[in-house]
Amino acid sequence: MKTGLWCTSAALAVSLSLLAASSASAEDSFYATAAAPYKGTTIRVLDEITPLQETLSKIVPEFEKETGIKVEWELLNHFEVINKGQADMLSGRGYYDAVMLHGFQVGPMLSAGAIKPVDDLVKNPKLDNPKLDTADFIPGPYKSLAFANGKQLGFVNWNYNQVYWARADLLNNPEEQAAFKAKYGYELAPAKTIEQMRDIAEFFTRKKGEKLAGKPLESDFYGIVLEGIKGGSTFGTLWRDFIKNYGGDIMDAEGHPTFDRPENVEALKMWAALWKFAPPGIAEYSLVDVPTVMGKGIAAQTLAWSDFVLGVDKPGGSPYAGQFVYGPIPVKAGATTPRSAEAEPSITVITAGSKHPEATFLFMQWLVDKKQQEKLIELGQGGVPVRETSWAMPAIKDSSNPTLYAAMKSTLDVGTAKPRMPKFYEVYDQLSGIAQEVGLGKLSPEEGAKKGQAEMLKLCDKCLL
């Protein structure tokens, strides 16, 4: 009797095991099944090259193996991916089936009709993965970027975000701590307010021969480094890390320019003050140069894109790897307005000229699928999450660099895509130039605010899509 009961139980266990395996296999084969009609198709996808995409490139071949769809995945630098991708999209020729767009590109591309919405593909049960779990996407970036005018454009692929980045070895040095407290009256620590960031910048700006952490400097040292080129993300930093944290903005809710408001003038004053403590070449620094300067140990602190940090703060990435600390973007002391932090969630969209939208849509889903996102984080020994569940992965939760991920999460908790502006590039070009002129002292903050308002009004009275 006991033997018979054991056999029955064993058979039941085997059946349940096979059923579970069959269920798991069915789930794993969704993309293979959905892709069957498109086997042998070749799609071309254009993306940006950062440490994140370099890691992802290792698993893209798995999609080809699973589906039989060939992916020609081209990676270009930040500026090239913008220029080449937009040129193809605006031409309508559809050389690329999908192009990665930064959030600020979406407005101009939408107004040009260069993006194919994915609503019809999402509604197709043969193509839409019912277990994609879009509710798991970090909501601010996803909801502000992937939808427009009642239509879905895609999913969030990259949650680029800025963090506060400083030299922990300097902030924790007892001599520097004592000297800082004697001068400013409070403890030296990672800046939580913009005013503290300014004090730290002033304090650590030293000339060659002066001592830093007890040792004579062989060259000048700077209290801060910021992006300063005309273009790149210079104005984005000023706008959403400074102006908005001062309670200002460049437009009102209806899109009417408000660049000359008093809060913006105050933010510009702080912006100009910080440039005095930066390296003399700041006006030529791009978003790529900022992490390079930090990695070489030339400056004490910065506001930088966290994905570039991943390539610097690691063994072999910098002589100072392991000696950095990170924090949320500092806010204005006593601010009562909502906290702001610069982020650039980015999306892979199907081009209006794509000849293979179905196969491309399957690849887009596969990229953001939880399984692939887990692999991406694991292979990269960290990364920048697009899903909430990624924060709990061991590579992040148990990271040797916990302050970096806490800082990332702080930004992504409030980070959103930029407002949809058809004339974003024209507006950005003007305001980026003004940001540089104010930083260099060629314009006073008041003059900069006045000029910015006038230039915006020349371009648009209502600047939103």
For each predicted feature, which ranges?
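Short, well-ordered beta-strand elements
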Residues: 39-50, 69-74, 97-98, 224
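Hinge/lid segment of periplasmic solute-binding proteins
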Residues: 27-37, 103-163, 213-220, 235, ...
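Short, solvent-exposed loop/beta-turn-alpha elements that line the ligand-binding surface or hinge
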Residues: 33-40, 120-136, 173, 178-183, ...
